């Protein structure tokens, strides 16, 4: 941890700087991949999976047998945690459902608003250093509550051609019936244009690296809607001496794990808390399977 004490005003602008996405140099490469996926479909996706994810695939869609095997491999504690998180997410988003109210503006003239779900949505869950099953839940639960009729999910496989069991389990309990082994630009292209295996959707949701961000921006120009360009993860925790250092450290690490460009910041007036959180970060890091 880098500890900065009582920074002068002249330092504030520097401290507030965040990692910026430099996408111009990637655009040509991204557009080339998108065009091949558009014209060659599954063949291009499978080829790029071999090139970028170092895996040879015969098919892209996860089978029912793979879903069943994944459920057996996820331990009981993780299943319970996933279900608890799913319930919390569902409770939160259910409260946001649009309630229409009819208003008679003139005798015989009734006006109202109506919220209609997007019929087909594509969810993208990146690979990286950890299985982001929380991202699956955050994307799939709102789509289910909104009433989307077709929800598909793309995520990169490992070099054995498998999706992490926790990803598949989270997808299944959240209501996603179709998952595809595709990552990066090729996954975005497949959902934007459609292939013989992966259906075309009307809107793409989910975070990704710089290449995924550029791909989403490109397909949004004329082909399909997107949620937003996602930047590097960041969190700022404002805490005083009453804060639990274990919780603060966990909050910081939960965002820092997303990548080397993530920003995790603690703002506090307590020297004691700084020392306790720093020690707790070191302790939790020592117990994590990846650093």
Where are the regions a protein language model picked out?
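Short, solvent-exposed amphipathic alpha-helical segments in soluble enzyme
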Residues: 138-140, 168-170, 196, 219-222, ...
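N-terminal small/polar loop signature for handling phosphorylated ligands or for N-terminal nucleophile
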Residues: 164-175, 192
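Conserved NAD(P)+-binding/catalytic subdomain of aldehyde/semialdehyde dehydrogenases
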Residues: 175-263
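A glycine- and small/hydrophobic-rich beta-loop-beta segment
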Residues: 258, 265-291
């Amino acid at each position: 941890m880098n500890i900065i004490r009582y920074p002068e005003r002249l330092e504030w602008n520097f401290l507030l700087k965040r990692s910026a996405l430099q996408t111009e140099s990637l655009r040509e490469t991204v557009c080339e991949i998108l065009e091949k996926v558009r014209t060659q479909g599954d063949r291009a996706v499978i080829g790029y999976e071999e090139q970028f994810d170092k895996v040879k695939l015969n098919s892209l869609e996860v089978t029912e047998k793979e879903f069943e095997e994944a459920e057996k491999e996820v331990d009981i504690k993780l299943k319970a945690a996933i279900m608890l998180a799913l319930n919390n997410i569902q409770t939160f988003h259910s409260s946001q459902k649009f309630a229409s109210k009819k208003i008679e503006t003139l005798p015989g003239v009734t006006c109202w608003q109506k919220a209609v779900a997007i019929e087909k949505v594509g969810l993208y869950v990146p690979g990286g250093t950890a299985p982001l099953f929380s991202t699956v839940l955050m994307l799939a639960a709102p789509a289910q509550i909104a009433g989307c009729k077709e929800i598909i999910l793309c995520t990169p496989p490992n070099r054995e051609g498998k999706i992490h069991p926790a990803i598949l389990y989270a997808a299944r309990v959240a209501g996603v019936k179709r998952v595809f082994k595709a990552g990066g630009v090729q996954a975005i292209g497949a959902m934007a244009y459609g292939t013989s295996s992966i259906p075309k959707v009307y809107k793409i949701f989910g975070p990704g690296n710089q290449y995924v961000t550029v791909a989403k921006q490109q397909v949004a120009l004329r082909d399909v809607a997107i949620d937003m360009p996602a930047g590097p993860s960041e969190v700022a925790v404002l805490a005083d001496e009453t804060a639990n250092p274990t919780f603060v450290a966990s909050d910081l690490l939960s965002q820092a794990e997303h990548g080397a460009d993530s920003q995790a910041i603690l703002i506090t007036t307590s020297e004691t808390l700084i020392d306790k959180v720093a020690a707790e970060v070191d302790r939790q890091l020592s117990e994590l399977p990846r650093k």
